Swiss-Prot record:
Name assigned to this protein: Trp operon repressor homolog
Biological process, per Gene Ontology: negative regulation of DNA-templated transcription
UniProt keywords, alphabetically: Cytoplasm, DNA-binding, Repressor, Transcription, Transcription regulation
HAMAP family: Trp_repressor (MF_00475)
Entry's localization field: Cytoplasm
Chief site of localization: cytoplasm
Record note on quaternary structure: Homodimer.
Family according to the record: Belongs to the TrpR family.
NCBIfam families on file: TrpR
GO cellular component terms given for this protein: cytoplasm
Primary role: This protein is an aporepressor. When complexed with L-tryptophan it binds the operator region of the trp operon and prevents the initiation of transcription.
Gene3D superfamilies in the record: TrpR-like (1.10.1270.10)
Length: 108
């Protein structure tokens, strides 16, 4: 026993995920690491960010749409506020492209 956690920094976890992605095993890794509830929470956060960045709905409307509490929406909003406009534009682009490519894959 080493006496300390092997992964003690967020960058180490990101490197682990990047390594798995390079091997096309990222889905397996995240499925093994996260419970179904944690995966649902992550999907909710992705949808929260997408809706907040679109800016079409109020936080209360997003809460009702996604079935999450207003406090959860507020936490997501506060996190987004800590990022630059360029970072938010990049995230929106990635979310849009990923959603479109997934929809195309489902039709096949």
């Amino acid at each position: 026993m080493s006496g300390s956690a092997k992964y003690s920094d967020w960058s180490q976890v990101m490197a682990l995920i990047a390594n798995a992605a390079e091997q096309n095993k990222h889905q397996s890794l995240l499925t093994m690491l996260m419970t179904p509830d944690e995966r649902e929470a992550l999907m909710a956060r992705v949808n929260i960010c997408h809706e907040l960045l679109q800016g079409d709905l109020s936080q209360r409307q997003i809460s009702q749409l996604l079935g999450v509490g207003v406090a959860t929406i507020t936490r997501g909003s506060n996190e987004l506020k800590s990022h630059t406009d360029d970072e938010k534009a990049w995230l929106m682009e990635v979310l849009e492209v990923s959603a479109k490519s997934d929809q195309g894959a489902r039709k096949e």
